[in-house]
């Protein structure tokens, strides 16, 4: 009896130490993911060479982060008892990877959102992104696309809300995953990027 109690205690301590280790690793990855993207806030004032340099640095950081996170997910699964920051780090690394990895881990993200480990909006964003990348209409209206507008000989670039599956039910769908009404989202996002984001309900995915 005493031996079993000792073994149980050892198992608990091992689990706690493992959680601390994963938290440390993943929280560090979160910090790297965010710090390497700080330059994008003032991107409009940067030269082409500076943008290229920062972009390369971001790609290198993302690659290293992906190697670590995907190794954990593929070998151990999604670790339990992580901090919110550590869980967020995993989602960010998935979101900032390539299309094939976003699809690969989409179902896992859905499960974690249903469990409350991630927010439902995290899943909604990733789901919409994978749909857009496959040329399909999005569900929750989280994705923006830049496209050329041609008027005569003039060509201008415009930001558009990627087409949605159900425009009339969009706000209701957004509400189910904790997202703000679409008009509020478009205004906030337009202010953030300094360009108006247009929702043209007549456009279909074929127009892009």
Model-derived regions, located:
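Bacterial Sec-dependent N-terminal signal peptides
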Residues: 1-26
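Start-of-domain marker
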Residues: 20-79, 87
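Second-shell loop/turn segments in exported
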Residues: 51-59, 91-97, 156-161
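Mature extracellular/secreted ectodomains of secretory-pathway proteins
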Residues: 73-145
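Catalytic cores of secreted/periplasmic lytic hydrolases that degrade extracellular macromolecules
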Residues: 144, 183, 188-207
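Short, 15-30-residue, compositionally biased linear elements
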Residues: 153-169
